[in-house]
């Protein structure tokens, strides 16, 4: 009980705040390419045209990928074991963008300066669509976030992309209505909590080393 209501320092706290641990970016090979993503400026839109010709001419640019270059095979970002309860709703790059900051193109180059320049030279023409901006109104709205036919859910968790539902469910213990009838006072309300992330602070990062360098 001596630890209850007492400040307990994490074992790695001092190392973290003084920058001693090694992160992925600290072990980048000298010849590693720099990759950055062109982000959508629209909350909901479909890419009508995307031109990377001028951007590809920037010295040092090795590759530019758009939705036309990636597999049309959806996957989930969930971390659960297979079969995941979260829907398979993501593409590496999608023709439809669903929020400000959604990925539009991936640029790889030899220097960060070259990649930044190329990002500014990619020309994108959008068909801007009405967006779902209020989660209270999202369910059964006329605007579908995922209207595509190859969206799927592997588990029966009440997911339905035609209703903007990634999952639905309820849990009840006992006769709730009967208990409420017997209460002298009943307080009803809608409550929200902030988003929480229980995982590490570092974002997803990967270095790929070709077989020739192994």
Model-inferred region functions:
Residues 1-211:
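Structural alpha/beta core scaffold segments of enzyme domains
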């Amino acid at each position: 009980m001596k630890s209850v209501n007492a400040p307990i320092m994490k074992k790695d706290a001092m190392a973290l705040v003084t920058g001693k641990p090694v992160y992925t970016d600290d072990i980048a090979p000298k010849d590693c390419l720099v990759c950055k993503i062109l982000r959508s400026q629209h909350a909901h839109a479909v890419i009508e045209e995307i031109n990377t010709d001028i951007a590809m001419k920037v010295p040092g640019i090795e590759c530019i990928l758009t939705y036309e270059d990636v597999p049309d095979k959806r996957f989930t970002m969930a971390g659960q074991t297979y079969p995941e309860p979260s829907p398979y709703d993501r593409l590496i790059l999608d023709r439809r963008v669903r929020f400000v900051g959604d990925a539009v193109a991936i640029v790889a180059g030899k220097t960060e300066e070259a990649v930044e320049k190329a990002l500014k030279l990619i020309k994108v023409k959008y068909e801007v669509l009405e967006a779902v901006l209020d989660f209270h109104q999202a369910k059964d709205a006329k605007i579908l976030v995922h209207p595509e036919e190859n969206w799927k859910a592997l588990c029966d968790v009440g997911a339905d992309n035609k209703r903007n539902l990634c999952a639905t469910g309820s849990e009840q213990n006992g006769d709730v209505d009967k208990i409420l009838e017997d209460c002298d006072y009943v307080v009803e309300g809608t409550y929200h909590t902030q988003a929480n992330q229980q995982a590490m602070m570092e974002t997803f990062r990967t270095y790929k080393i070709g077989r020739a360098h192994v």
